[in-house]
């Protein structure tokens, strides 16, 4: 299987604070990579560099056939093209409150990609059905639960037809009872062959869905491999310590 995403030597600092140190990994097309690690380990920053929401200071990131060397000057057009390769789902769903669910989902395709409105609407209805919210198309975000809003956020990211889906702790802000609905949608996407990178605290979910797990600590990829290795027989003491604390908190 060819790699859809390759990350080579990514570095990132905020002021004096170095957040990512020489981060490199590959994500084969049609696979799911889970990124785990303690708070402040750089997980979210890694994800944000993949969408250039945070621009890496150096390193090369390739998505599909578009390769960007962040040590060089990157022009705006290239950066925009790079950003459109991936769809991002945040911890909080960031929906536009004054727009209906349907309007939220068609906004990107119509405004950014200049797609015909009727085509975007048909696509949006199909995506809302996929995330189990077809009947909520004309409601406003405040009328939905947090979990439903998050699923609209997923539909909105899918609407731009990205090559790669990025999830930043998509369930961390949700009521525990609603977590399952969102995870089910992500699992369905995995079964449909979407290529995804998911930052998550849901270790059991990572075990079920991920093909590869990266353990990040202090901005370094300390360990990576299939979930059955990283999550059940980690080689690094730090990975073991982290997993013990998460799986047996008391």
Language model features: what each stretch is:
Residues 228-250:
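C-terminal boundary and immediately downstream tail of ABC-type ATPase nucleotide-binding domains
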């Amino acid at each position: 299987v060819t790699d859809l995403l390759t990350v080579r030597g990514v570095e990132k600092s905020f002021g004096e604070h170095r957040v990512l140190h020489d981060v490199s990994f590959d994500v084969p097309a049609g696979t799911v990579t889970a990124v785990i690690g303690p708070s402040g380990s750089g997980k979210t920053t890694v994800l944000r560099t993949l969408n250039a929401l945070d621009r890496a200071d150096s390193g090369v990131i390739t998505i599909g056939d578009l390769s960007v060397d962040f040590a060089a000057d990157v022009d705006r057009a290239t950066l925009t093209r790079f950003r459109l390769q991936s769809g991002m789902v945040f911890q909080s769903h960031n929906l536009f409150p004054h727009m209906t669910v349907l309007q939220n989902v068609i906004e990107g395709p119509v405004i950014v990609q200049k797609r015909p409105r009727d085509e975007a609407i048909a696509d949006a209805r199909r995506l809302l059905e996929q995330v189990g919210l077809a009947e909520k198309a004309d409601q406003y975000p405040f009328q939905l639960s947090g979990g439903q809003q998050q699923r609209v956020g997923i539909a909105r990211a899918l609407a731009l037809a990205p090559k790669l889906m990025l999830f930043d702790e998509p369930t961390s802000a949700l009521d525990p009872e609603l977590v399952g609905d969102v995870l089910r949608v992500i699992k369905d996407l995995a079964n449909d062959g979407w290529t995804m990178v998911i930052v998550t605290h849901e270790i059991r979910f990572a075990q079920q869905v991920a093909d590869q797990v990266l353990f990040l600590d202090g901005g370094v990829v300390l360990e990576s491999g299939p979930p059955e290795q990283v999550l059940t027989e980690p080689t690094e003491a730090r990975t073991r310590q982290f997993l013990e604390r998460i799986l047996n908190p008391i």
